[in-house]
Amino acid sequence: MAFSISKKAAVAALFSFLVVTCVAGARPGNFSASDFTADPNWEVARATWYGAPTGAGPDDDGGACGFKNTNQYPFSSMTSCGNEPIFKDGKGCGSCYQIRCVNHPACSGNPETVIITDMNYYPVSKYHFDLSGTAFGAMAKPGQNDQLRHAGIIDIQFKRVPCNFPGLKVTFHVEEGSNPVYFAVLVEYEDGDGDVVQVDLMEANSQSWTPMRESWGSIWRLDSNHRLTAPFSLRITNESGKQLVASQVIPANWAPMAVYRSFVQYSS
């Protein structure tokens, strides 16, 4: 996670903010769309980066959305924190954006696609992408990745795009600590919107759906007043209101920390 309440992280955050303030001093903090080439399909933002220069962001290759192994396919380290208008208190997790940098000589101007996997609270701009080092460097001209990363903070343009995870179906990772009266699951790899705004669970031999609640990030939980009876079907709803049902995707012999792949997927 990019934000921590530990003393060490607080000092790092203060240092990062001071650096951002100094770098941003070269141009107004409240810049307008007129600073960029007019393009109605793109919005303006600022970008920073964190973690290793060629890493996926967090040291544990995770983040505030709960995704695992973001250094591997399909994330492939092309990840980003989003501030609240992008992160949306966790409901923006998994959404995909095209980004391209401007106003720096090392910028290629070519769009790159990133996935929201983490959050940030730094007061940089209305829209702020705190990118992995890999994603930040990907916006550079060939051979100028490090030069662009050394800029620290840059102007970018961005737009929301459909997610597309070739060869993958919606996947459910049962979280550690789940038991017969507490069930928590990470939802990932949704094409289209990429995000999830609601998850519902149906027990075996039941005809009704029980709403789960967002635990944090893309992890949803159900605290039950009775022992849950598997197999479970899960129904997910994305930001557009489209629903998918993964029938009996969680088997009767489910286990914490196990991954269960469905046979369903949104159209991208």
From Swiss-Prot:
SUPFAM superfamilies: Barwin-like endoglucanases, PHL pollen allergen. Induction: By gibberellin (GA3) and wounding. Residues 181-262 form the Expansin-like CBD domain. Glycans are attached at residues 30, 238. Keywords: Cell wall, Cell wall biogenesis/degradation, Disulfide bond, Glycoprotein, Membrane, Secreted, Signal. The keyword Glycoprotein applies. One of its GO terms (cellular component) is extracellular region. InterPro entries: Expan_Lol_pI, Expansin/allergen_DPBB_dom, Expansin_CBD, Expansin_CBD_sf, LolPI, RlpA-like_DPBB, RlpA-like_sf. It is a peripheral membrane protein. GO terms for biological process: plant-type cell wall loosening; sexual reproduction. Expressed in roots, coleoptiles and internodes. Belongs to the expansin family. Expansin B subfamily. This is Expansin-B3. It comes from Oryza sativa subsp. japonica. The gene is EXPB3.
